[in-house]
Amino acid sequence: MTKHVEIFTDGSCLGNPGPGGYGIVLRYKQTEKTLAKGYTLTTNNRMEMLAAVVALQTLKEPCQVTLTTDSQYVRQGITQWIHNWKKRGWKTADKKPVKNADLWQALDKETARHKVDWHWVKGHAGHRENEICDELARTAAENPTEEDTGYQAS
């Protein structure tokens, strides 16, 4: 029987671009685990995406996942836009390279391992887990330890 895991994610950036971080809450039955990491130079969207990628990578086996994010960019990108990007060889409708293609490809790979149901919540609206993720992401952004090697300043 496939395990059902709840995942909550958030990304933060102090300046955009600037130092950033992600926060994750993973819940399986009654057990919760939190993850966070800060990066010296990145963007808000990259941190939102990286949170989802890392959370899904953390799962050791294929799972039924309910993933809740406050990022429409992530939710719409992975459920709607990605299909045409892949058909066009990771180009947008106007033939430009898709931004953050490295993370979209990683997210695509991870979602293929799991059955993911994507949910959106309004940020800063009192959702307990989203508020926890927001705090984790902000704290991580204030104390960055990693380099976002995929980030390219444009």
UniProtKB/Swiss-Prot annotation:
Its main location: cytoplasm. It catalyses: Endonucleolytic cleavage to 5'-phosphomonoester. It comes from the Bacteria. Residues 1-142 form the RNase H type-1 domain. The gene is rnhA. Belongs to the RNase H family. Mg(2+) 1 binds at D10, E48, D70. This is Ribonuclease H. Mg(2+) 2 binds at D10, D134. One of its GO terms (molecular function) is magnesium ion binding. It holds the Pfam family RNase_H. Keywords: Cytoplasm, Endonuclease, Hydrolase, Magnesium, Metal-binding, Nuclease. Its EC number is 3.1.26.4. It is an enzyme of class 3 (hydrolase). GO terms for cellular component: cytoplasm. The keyword Magnesium applies. Binds 1 Mg(2+) ion per subunit. May bind a second metal ion at a regulatory site, or after substrate binding.
